[in-house]
């Protein structure tokens, strides 16, 4: 059920006494009303499973874990607000002949450019059909042909038709189904407009944690109630990071504004292991519209359906870069488009669908058709202006095959995690199935050990002392924009040693400014998101500098060749 928490009354002794609720109180004996700072109210809650995030990963885990104990879902916006809702193309699984597991495995390994964990790839591919069946049983409707078989699509990097989809709104269909199921599950509590600030570890008991600290444990999280303005100490036996991606570290992204890398940043600050952050996937084709954020995704399935990329001169340029043409993997297509734009000085390239059947386009891609039509583009007659946009993080919180991080009692699933499936580049439509497989496995694993876990009662409440209202919001908003500009200009599709060095120097200045501001300011969503984006940006830069080669999604003009193929 959805929770609406009312503020608790407080009673403090001192010069007179304080009495009252949320933001104001009566100072007895003085006869005046004194305004209390937001986030003054103290509250503790306990739950077996604390799930941070409400996309396919978080909601699927919650539904499975509810069989083992009480689940609390924390999401910083509405329950349905997630990256999942924006996924258009589909979800990949072997569902018909002549496709088979070995072909899907091979396609995934090729896309991952020598960096995939083959054991993980095999596990996900082989379990994928069962997880698809789970979604179907929950009520997700995938498109079928007239003969009743599934209407499987083919996307870049896939050698067979294996993409199940619901029109071009697959993510939205999955999210809607899961949201309804979660709302009707009595063992799940939902906390909307609640922002996870930090995960709780031995650090909050006074220990000094370093990377080599033995057996770091997670005991829950500090969570800000954004509506009632208080910080809740959530104590949990199991904590699950399902916070999605971090696309908003860049100026142009297909991600919604909530994608600020919160989970990755929290785990990094808690000394968890983060890996492969240099591998940021830029979707090759977002609709070119400088005044709109997030960028509207022009699904890869359109190219699978037959759409062709052209430069401003009308040339089908992709064959110059890869024999697969417009159906090459995303990293190749994104770099090709980026090069064409820079070579000709253009703001975008074209995606041409005009040679395709108009009725078929409208039927298979109603979302793209309607969205473009609203902007004066009839995709059955007009070329679509497209540009690459930050889309997906292949790196994240390192986990094992059950979704466990190196921090005990802490799991990570979905885009926030790094499982080894994607390697240096994600194969199209492999993200939703990864989330479904790992949320299932994480729920089974954590549920099986729940009885041996206890709450850590010694965790102190949030300390607001020494903080006051944010001095000037402009300090946050301008730094937010500056981080995005630094990352876009210097740490984008094509990188160099000099660009990365400059990005690091400038980001360090912003980091120091924001940390000082954070420590003396009351909690706000924006300052926390900026803090997380700075951490994530630093991780991308650091790992990009360490990679002295070009591989997958990481391309450096100073190190254009690939070195060893070791994982």
Region annotations inferred by a language model:
Residues 49-73:
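N-terminal Rossmann-like FAD-binding beta1-loop-alpha1 element of flavoenzymes
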Residues 93-124:
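Glycine-rich active-site loop/strand segments that organize a redox cofactor
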Residues 137-230, 235, 242, 286-289:
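Conserved redox-cofactor binding core of oxidoreductases
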Residues 266, 272-384, 436, 445-451:
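An anion/pyrophosphate-binding glycine-rich loop and adjacent beta-alpha core
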Residues 116-129, 162-180, 191, 253-261, ...:
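Short beta-strand to alpha-helix junction loop
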Residues 67-88, 97:
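Glycine-rich FAD pyrophosphate-binding loop
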Residues 43-47, 64, 78-80, 87-92, ...:
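Glycine- and aromatic-enriched mobile tails/lids
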Residues 13-16, 20, 28-29:
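Glycine-biased, low-complexity coil/linker segments
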């Amino acid at each position: 059920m959805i929770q609406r928490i009312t503020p608790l009354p407080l009673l403090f002794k001192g010069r007179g006494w304080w009495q009252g609720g949320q933001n104001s109180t009566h100072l007895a004996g003085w006869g005046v009303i004194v305004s209390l700072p937001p986030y003054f109210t103290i509250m503790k809650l306990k739950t077996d499973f604390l799930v941070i995030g409400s996309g396919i990963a978080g909601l699927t885990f919650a539904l499975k874990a509810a069989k083992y104990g009480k689940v609390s879902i924390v999401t910083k916006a509405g329950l349905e607000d997630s990256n999942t809702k924006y996924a258009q193309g589909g979800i990949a699984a072997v569902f018909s002949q002549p496709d088979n597991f070995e072909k899907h495995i091979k396609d995934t390994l090729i896309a991952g450019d020598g960096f995939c964990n083959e054991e993980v790839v095999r596990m996900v591919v082989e379990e994928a059909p069962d997880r698809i069946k789970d979604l179907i049983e929950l009520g997700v409707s995938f498109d079928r042909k007239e003969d009743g078989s599934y209407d499987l699509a083919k996307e870049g990097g896939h050698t067979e038709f294996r993409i199940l989809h619901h029109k071009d709104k697959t993510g939205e269909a999955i999210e809607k189904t899961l949201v309804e199921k979660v709302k009707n599950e009595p063992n799940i509590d939902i906390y909307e407009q609640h922002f996870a600030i930090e995960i709780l570890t031995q650090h909050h008991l006074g220990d000094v944690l370093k990377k080599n600290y033995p057996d770091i444990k997670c005991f829950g999280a500090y969570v800000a109630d954004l509506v009632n303005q208080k910080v809740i100490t959530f104590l949990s036996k199991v904590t699950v990071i399902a916070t999605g991606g971090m696309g908003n570290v860049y100026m142009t992204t297909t991600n919604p504004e909530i994608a600020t890398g919160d989970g990755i940043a929290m785990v990094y600050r808690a000394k968890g292991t983060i890996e492969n952050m240099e591998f940021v996937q830029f979707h090759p084709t977002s609709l070119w519209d400088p005044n709109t954020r997030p960028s509207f995704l022009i699904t890869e399935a359109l190219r699978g359906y037959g759409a062709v990329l052209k430069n401003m001169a009308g040339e089908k340029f992709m064959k110059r870069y890869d024999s697969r043409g417009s159906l090459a993997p995303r990293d190749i297509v994104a770099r090709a488009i980026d090069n064409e734009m820079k070579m000709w000085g253009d703001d975008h390239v074209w995606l041409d669908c005009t040679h395709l059947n108009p009725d078929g386009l409208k039927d298979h891609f109603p979302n793209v058709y309607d969205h473009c039509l609203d902007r004066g583009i009839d995709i059955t007659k007009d070329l679509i202006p497209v540009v690459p946009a930050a889309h997906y993080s292949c790196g994240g919180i390192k986990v094992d095959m059950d979704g466990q991080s190196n921090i005990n009692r802490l799991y990570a699933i979905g885009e926030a995690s790094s499982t080894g499936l994607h390697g240096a580049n994600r194969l199209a439509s492999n993200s939703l199935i990864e989330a479904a497989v790992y949320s299932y496995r994480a729920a089974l694993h954590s549920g099986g050990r729940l009885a041996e876990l206890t709450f850590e009662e010694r965790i102190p409440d949030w300390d607001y002392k020494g903080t006051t209202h944010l001095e000037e919001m402009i300090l946050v908003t301008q730094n937010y924009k500056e981080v995005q500009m630094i990352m876009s200009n210097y740490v984008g599709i094509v990188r160099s040693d000099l660009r990365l060095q400059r990005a690091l120097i400038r980001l360090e200045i912003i980091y120091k400014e924001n940390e000082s501001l954070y420590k003396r300011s009351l909690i706000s969503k924006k300052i926390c998101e900026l803090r997380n984006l700075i951490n994530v940006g630093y991780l991308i830069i650091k790992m990009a500098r360490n990679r002295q080669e070009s591989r997958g999604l990481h391309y450096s003009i100073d190190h254009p060749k690939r070195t060893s193929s070791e994982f």
